[in-house]
Amino acid sequence: MLEVKFYDTADDSLLKFAVIISKSDNKWVFCKHKERNTLEVPGGHREHGESILDTAKRELYEETGAIVYTIEPVCIYSVIGKTRANDTGEESYGMLYFAKITEFESQLHSEIEKVFKLDELPTEWTYPLIQPQLIKEAERRGFL
């Protein structure tokens, strides 16, 4: 079982992931990875020497093609338990962001096959025990 926790602050060195809840034209923005049949919120791993905000901006561009947007931090989150991105099960930390995308590049240049703009949240999630909780927390904090 996974446990998701939320924090207002944490040491920057702990932040290994950025996840970006995104909307465009009042629709949810989700990605479909080429190797999966599920949908996910844009996000990914922080690269060495990269700020966590730069991670979020890079991942948002790579996974959605977003080129004009606003982005703001929501909170820090952690996940305890084994996941596709963490096989040790130890607590891992990330920064949750919210972005409003106003313009997309015409082609994707990543492992993402397709970007979806949805009126409703999906039913088939890549990370069903994590990402719905991140969205609920962003909602609770007044971002959605």
Model-derived features with residue positions:
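Acidic, metal-coordinating catalytic segment for phosphate/diphosphate chemistry
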Residues: M1-V19
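Conserved Nudix-box catalytic region and its N-terminal flanking loop in Nudix hydrolases
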Residues: K23-E62
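A short coil-to-beta-strand element that immediately follows conserved catalytic motifs
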Residues: I67-I76
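Active-site-adjacent beta-strand/loop module that shapes the phosphate/pyrophosphate-binding cleft
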Residues: Y77-E105
